[in-house]
């Protein structure tokens, strides 16, 4: 398979730059593989495609403000995009700068005196060390929500809420699990009223999700890694669904 096999025209005017007023107002494309048909619906119609025997599995990862701006000792500007936290004070990150910083270099975050130390580099990722009180606390005051590259606007206050699912709980993602963004509390309540079972897992979406495929032969593409956790209860319920021949969505 070649990368060119998947290329198609997508006019920029069709890429929404801001979310709809209500989550459920997003558009929904319904593909019927058996009938070979495509329908365009609203996400509020999603419930009509569910059955009481279904199991819905949601990703409860929570997006952190993972984009930072700073400068090197030389004065050069630096942009940091966290890939994933490896401890409370260390993280893998992508760095954009005119010249890549070397191990031992200090990056001072913009509008503060917060020093971030470069511990090392492996491929396109740098290992960074943040000072106390740790990455989460520093991100809350210094970081920005890392909007996808196809969003051609500056971050807004609304993004902290709308670029987050309503069931987000476990901090660690640098990008939202986008399919989950369209669910709101009333829809989740309606799912429960229909007797449809729900389960949770955690998969921290990494910055690699923004990286384009660099090779022409798709089979040679190296996928990035992401941290995940599947609770034993969720695994058991998924297995029970499969055993009974029921759907897991």
Model-found features: residue ranges?
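Surface-exposed, charge/polar-rich loops and edge strands
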Residues: 1-249
């Amino acid at each position: 398979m070649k990368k060119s096999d998947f290329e198609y025209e997508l006019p920029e005017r069709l890429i929404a730059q801001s979310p709809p007023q209500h989550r459920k107002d997003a558009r929904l494309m319904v593909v019927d593989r058996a009938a070979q048909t495509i329908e365009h619906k609203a996400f509020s119609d999603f419930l009509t495609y569910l059955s009481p025997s279904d199991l819905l599995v949601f990703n409860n990862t929570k997006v952190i403000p993972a984009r930072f701006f700073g400068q090197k000792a030389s004065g050069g500007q630096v942009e940091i995009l966290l890939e994933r936290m490896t401890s409370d004070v260390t993280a893998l990150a992508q760095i954009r700068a005119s010249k890549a910083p070397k191990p031992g270099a200090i990056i001072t975050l913009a509008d503060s005196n917060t020093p971030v130390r470069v511990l090392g580099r492996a491929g396109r990722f740098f290992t960074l060390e943040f000072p106390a009180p740790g990455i989460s606390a520093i991100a809350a005051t210094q970081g920005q929500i890392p909007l996808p590259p196809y969003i051609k606007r500056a971050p807004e206050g609304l993004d902290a809420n709308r670029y987050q699912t309503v069931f987000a709980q476990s901090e660690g993602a640098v990008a939202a699990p986008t399919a989950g963004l369209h669910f709101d509390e009333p829809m989740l309540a309606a799912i429960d009223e229909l007797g449809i079972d729900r389960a949770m897992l955690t998969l921290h979406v990494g910055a690699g999700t923004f990286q384009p495929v660099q090779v022409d032969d798709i089979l040679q593409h190296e996928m990035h890694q992401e941290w995940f956790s599947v609770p034993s209860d969720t695994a058991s319920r998924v297995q029970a669904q499969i055993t009974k021949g029921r759907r897991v969505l």
